[in-house]
Amino acid sequence: KVLEVRVVADASIAYEDFGAGDPSTMNRETVVQKLLKSGVWPVIRQRPFDLVADPAKEPKSIFVSCFDTNPLAPDLDYIVHNHANEFQTGLNALSKLTKGKVNIVVNSKTAAREFLDAKNVVRQTVDGPHPAGNVGVQIHHLDPISKGEQVWVAGVQDVLIIGRLFL
């Protein structure tokens, strides 16, 4: 019979350091291994079917939707504000994962310099009511998937997390 269970905190908290590094100077395998080892890899999803991306495969392209039309969706311009370095570093890491394009899809009314000044990407502009901000709709119109192909997607907040991992 168990009368009591005590959970006692450690005197100090320790985190594993995955090390900083510029992803633009790394090869694909190094970027993939760092994302896998750190546990960040599952934020990268593959379409069709919205599964966790298979690191052994290479996508046709990668999409980052910077425009969300879902009801009650957060303002992505606000989320990325003052995080240009993290966002660009995350995009640089994603660009190592494909020989194709990294597309960022923005609203035509965006004022976020972090989106407008992004480098090493193809900026696509969309406008309109929901579902214009849905990444699946964006892929369908901008870079349709054919049989046997994959397109990977990551959200703005995911790109920021990836960027912070490398900084």
Regions flagged by a language model, labelled:
Residues V2-L167:
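Buried, small/hydrophobic-residue-enriched core segments of structured protein domains
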